[in-house]
Structures are given as C-alpha cells and as structure tokens.
Amino acid sequence: MINMRDNPTMHVLQASKFLFLALILIQLLSTQLFAQRSKSPWQTLTGDAPLVIARGGFSGLLPDSSLDAYSFVSQTSVPGAVLWCDVQLTKDAIGLCFPDVKMMNASNIQDVYPKRKTSYLLNGVPTQDWFTIDFNFKDLTKVILKQGILSRSAAFDGNSYGISTVKDISTQLKPEGFWLNVQHDAFYAQHNLSMSSFLLSISKTVIIDYLSSPEVNFFRNIGRRFGRNGPKFVFRFLEKDDVEVSTNQTYGSLAGNLTFLKTFASGVLVPKSYIWPIESQYLLPRTSFVQDAHKAGLEVYASGFGNDFDLAYNYSFDPLAEYLSFMDNGDFSVDGLLSDFPLTASSAVDCFSHLGSNASSQVDFLVISKNGASGDYPGCTDLAYTKAIKDGADVIDCSLQMSSDGIPFCLSSINLGESTNVVQSPFRNRSTTVPEIGSLPGIYSFSLAWSEIQTLRPAIENPYSREFTMFRNPRERSSGKFVSLSDFLNLAKNSSSLTGVLISVENATYLREKQGLDAVKAVLDTLTEAGYSNKTTTTRVMIQSTNSSVLIDFKKQSRYETVYKVEETIRDILDTAIEDIKKFADAVVISKKSVFPTSESFTTGQTKLVERLQKFQLPVYVEVFRNEFVSQPWDFFADATVEINSHVTGAGINGTITEFPLTAARYKRNSCLTRKDVPPYMIPVQPAGLLTIVSPASLPPAEAPSPVFTDADVTEPPLPPVSARAPTTTPGPQSTGEKSPNGQTRVALSLLLSAFATVFASLLLL
C-alpha cells in the first residue's frame, strides 16, 4: 500500500483530480442555469421573473414605512413581493424602518420636538434637520409618520402611524422577502453607532434576505461576518457624478468595473437612467449595462419607479409601459424593480409581459378614441388618427366642425383657439362672441374657409398644464395635418383593424339658424360619397350627439347607429327618460364621475347607471380616460390600467372613450383576466374603499349629490330649418389702421386679441 504522505507526486495528482471534478461540477451547474434561462421567457440572470420590491411598503399611497403600507403589499402584489426597509439607527442603537436619516420630511417630528433641530455633515454637506441619531427610540414613540411626497394624498397622515422597528416589521408581518437598505453607514460610524453590529445582532431573530448599501466599505466590513448563509449583498449605485466615499471614485466610474463589485456583491441596484438614459424627458438609446452586469454574474435591480413620478414622454404618462420597457423589451430583463406602487409592478410582471402583438383579446369592450390618440399628438390630426389605429383602437372618432364654405372636418373644438395657432395667425381679427356657444370671445371654425384652416398649425391640448404644469409630448406639440371628414372616413375604410367610426355632431341648431350650415346633411352626404351608405365597406358608423334632436334627424334619414351623450354628471336616471332615449339612440355615453362619484379625488361609491341603462339594452360608453395620474381618483393608485379595469370588469361598461387608446387596447389582452383565480392586482377596486381607512377628521366633506336625469332633460324641439346664407366672404388680414364705422381705430379688439394670443401661447405652445 502506497503512503500518500510519503509520495508528493500522488498527492499532487489527487489534488488535480479534485480540482478537475470541481471545475466539471461548476460547468455543469452553469450549463444547467443557462438551460433554465434559455427555456424561460425572462432574460434575467437566473431566468426567474423579476422581483417586485416595495419601497417602504405601498408608499405611493400610505406614509412610507408605516405598518399599513407594509401590510398592504401582500394584499395587492405578486406572491414573494419583497418589503424594502431603509434602516436608520437611533441614539440608543435601535434599528428603525424609516425612509431617511433626516426625519422632517416624512414625520411630524418638528411639531413634537421643535427645538431639537441640529446640523451635521452628511456626505460632506452641512445639513440641518432632525436626525435619528439625536433621539432615543422612546422619544420617537411620540412621533407619527406622514406622506413625504406632496403630489400624494395627505389624508392618511391623520391615521397616527407610529415609527416601526426592523424587528416589528419582521415579527408582525413575516414578509416572504425582507430587504434592508443601509444608506449612511459611514455617517453612523462617525457618531459611534455601528450598523454592522446592529445587523449581526438582529439577524439572529430576523431573516434578512437582501442587504444593500452605496458604500463599498460597508460590505468589506460586514461580508465575512455573515458567512455563507447570510443575505444577498447588493451594491447600490447613486447618481453617476456622486462620489463613493470609501473608494473616492464616482459611481459612473464604478459602473465600468463590474468585476470588482462581483468580489463582494451578488447584485447591483441602479437608478433607471443607468439603463435607459433620458434627455429633456425623452428616452435615449438604452445602454448595455444590464447585459454587462449579467455577463459579470451580477443581478440588476432598477430603482426609481413611481406611478406619479415624471416619466419620459415616450411612455405617454403610463407607468405600466415604463415597467414593461425594463423587463420585456426583447433584449434583457432587469432582475427586480424597486417601486412605490408594487401593484402596478406586479401586474406588469404577471399580466402584461410577453403578450406579443398577436395576443388575443380577453375581454369584450370597445376602445374608442377621443380625437384620435390626442394624448400623444394634436387631436384630430392625421398623426393622432394613425397612432390610434396602430395602438389598437376599435373605433376612431371625429369631432365634426364646419368651415365657412361648408366643408365638414374633424377638430376637437368649434373654437379654433383651443386647438390651433389661429390667435397667432393673420386671422386673429375674426374673433367674435357667440352666446349660444360660450360667454368668451373666440375664433370659430365657421369664420374661416377650409383652405384658410389648412394654413393653421394644430396645437396639442394640455388639460393639466395650468394646475399641475404637466405638458404632453412637446416635440410633437404642433405636428400633423388637419383632416376633413372625407379623409377621415377614407382612412378608416382602408384600415383592416378598425371596426368602426364615431362622428360627434354638436352645435347643429346654431349652425343651421345663424350660419346657414347643415351639419347633418354634410355628414350624410360625405358618408355616401365615401361608400358607407351602399355597403361597400363593413366599417360600423356611429353618430354621437348631446342633442336628441340631432339624433332624431339622423334616424329619420339613415340607418346608422346613434349614440346619446349625457353631458352632465348624474347619479341616476328615470326609467321614463331611458325609454325616451331608447326611441332615438342605440347607445349612451356618460362620464366617469357618473359611474364612480368622487370627493376630493376619493371615490365615494358606485351608481347603478350602467346597470340600469344596460337593462334597456343600451350599451354604455364612458369618457374620458386619460393616462395622467392626476386624472384618476386616489383609489386607482395613479394607474390608468387599474381605472380601466374597475370600469370594465367592475362596473361592466361596454366601451372606453380614451385619449390614449394603447392603454385600453393593451388591457384587453391582459393574461390575468381569464384565470380561475384572478390575482389581487387585477381585482376591481372597492368603491369608497380607501375612505374606510381614512381617519374621521381627514375625511373629505360630503358633496351635494349629482342630479337625476329626467324626461325633461331628454326632450328638445326639433332642429330648425337651414337659414339662407349670406354670400360667403373671406376677409383677409386686418390692417392696424382699419377704421370702424364711427371712425375710431379698433384698439379695444386688438388689445383683447393680443391678450388672447399671449394666454394661448403660454398654455398650449410652450
């Protein structure tokens, strides 16, 4: 028998054999991992679905790090959603879950301890605030949490949420995944507080699944002390120009040395801009950061997701579209998303990823455009209609207007000043006041010939520019061409995906009586010329109006579908009124607030309007759906898809009228809708549900109920005959010296139009 201790050669051979076997084992494991990933639709490092990480719980709604914010995650998110806790230390070394070492923004501490504001160097910058290190935990039991982002509801601040410890969150909620983030390890060390000691101590009773920090030294110090069974270490990147304190390198520089990070971390957490850079709020080409990190064996988690944050214009104010661009773009998937709204992240992962362009519809309702895709382009232009068709609209609409020479065309308003640059044009002198239309002066479509209107530039409408300074797609704010009704009908007829068109006819009585223009005849004649009346096209035609007299006139002269629009917000409708509507209309349009009444942006209940109208076999279409989060009640979590789901699946409406057809069309292909067990993030919201968790002192005031729609609201006199028209004239630009009949220069009108032009330019064309 050979003694290996006495035979060095055999010893080396045996060691080589073990090394060889180890290499084979590693290769086999790598091959298995690659095979697992290649079979998965996910292009994450492991092939698993991206992780949903709830920053401070559901902090987009409830105060960050409150117990309710954390507990709400399990009720609204995918199984396995991870709770994120920003760990702060108190003076007596108790670990808290609190969003920052500075306390003023997210609590009422300045009210409780007004004289205990201090100043410290934080990341090298002198900073004044109330710091956790100046208070024992007992002191902080008197402090309550509040919403730290002003664009979010403060109604829940009155719930007196206390500050929770790390142990509280773990023991009371038992999260499936728990992520601790240590943002200021060096700062605590400077004040004789050891974050490492706290974490090692708490890990004996609390399971820590992930541990992140933006400081390299933190991982160097704690890494070997946790051992193999410790949490996953994730290095957190700050902005590219920020300097990492222990290496004195910028984070942008560290992003180019991923192999170094792999020596102590299994993953990296980066701001979204490392992956999708943005310039002037538009996306630049995506980087190779995710692929590079995956090659280095690092998982990539993306941060900075919030439904109410400023999104790139490319996403059309749709947070779901942003999530999908980071996980389902054909090139890579991030391994996790850090979000204030885990519900939206969950639905992106589980319901809307990997649908493909040919995914079939899972729910039956009509997606009807509102002036085309008017959230992305100026309404009623060729670009808005083309995008609406491309985005999956079932029906495109034309808001009918008439030019002075009797040409019917599509434009969102009869007042050209609301959607064109007319007040900056040579036609600005054609302003007039029409009491039948509005109390303020305007430049109306019937004051210009079609050839003159075509010289104007369209203007995108910005419904939230004044109150919220939110502007739509500024690069395309004046793009596109105006579309005649004839061109609109031909565009629709030549589309293979559309099922129909909707033509909205308003102000017909005024146009007949005062302008000698017959909108009804113009529509019918154009439909005939375009081949819609002789069945040469199968495209469905719907005529909409708020006037029963208009629809009755159409019914007498054609067989097109008619749609009655209830202009007012109502809470109910009499059966007799429905019976009257049924005589001349095939469907009804109502507002969102007529389905879900609101008070101070909270839903207060649900009416029975949809159910009552449908009982009389009248389909119900609801308007107007927008992506901007400020257009939605808090109950819908700043997510247009949640709002659509609650109206379609919850209220049972038959169609959405939307300025962003893509959002509604994508919802129709939602893979979660046909499951036996619908996940919580795809269950319609409970009307007035949020009000049940608002403290009585913070409840919004009761509002006067909306009216009940009656027979009298429906009944109208018939349309008047068309008056004789005066000879058509096309006055040119007015000189500054033109005299009025009394010999005075029209200074007052010029001043009025100048002010009108200034307001228009500031609101629409900035």
Swiss-Prot record:
Provide the glycosylation site positions.
Answer: 105, 192, 248, 257, 314, 358, 429, 494, 507, 534, 547, 654
**Segments passing through the bilayer:** 746-766
| GO biological process terms, semicolon-separated | cell wall organization; glycerol metabolic process; lipid metabolic process
Q: Which GO terms describe its molecular function?
A: glycerophosphodiester phosphodiesterase activity
**Gene3D superfamilies documented for this protein:** Phosphatidylinositol (PI) phosphodiesterase (3.20.20.190)
Alphabetical list of PROSITE patterns matching this protein = GP_PDE (PS51704)
InterPro entries listed in its UniProt record:
GP_PDE_dom, PLC-like_Pdiesterase_TIM-brl
Q: In which tissues is it expressed?
A: Expressed in roots, leaves, stems, flowers and siliques.
Record key words, sorted: Cell membrane, Cell wall biogenesis/degradation, Glycerol metabolism, Glycoprotein, Hydrolase, Membrane, Repeat, Signal, Transmembrane, Transmembrane helix
Q: Which Pfam families match?
A: GDPD
Ranges of residues in domain GP-PDE: 50-349, 365-668
Q: Which residues lie on this side of the membrane: Extracellular?
A: 36-745
Catalytic activity reported = a sn-glycero-3-phosphodiester + H2O = an alcohol + sn-glycerol 3-phosphate + H(+)
Extent of Polar residues compositional bias? 726-743
Signal peptide location in the record?
A: 1-35
Region described as Disordered: spans on this chain: 704-743
The record describes its membrane topology as: Single-pass type I membrane protein
Q: What is its EC number?
A: 3.1.4.46
Subcellular location(s) per record? Cell membrane
What do the Gene Ontology cellular component annotations say? Answer: plasma membrane; plasmodesma; plastid; secretory vesicle
Q: What family does this belong to?
A: Belongs to the glycerophosphoryl diester phosphodiesterase family.
Q: What is this protein called?
A: Glycerophosphodiester phosphodiesterase GDPDL4
| Name of encoding gene | GDPDL4
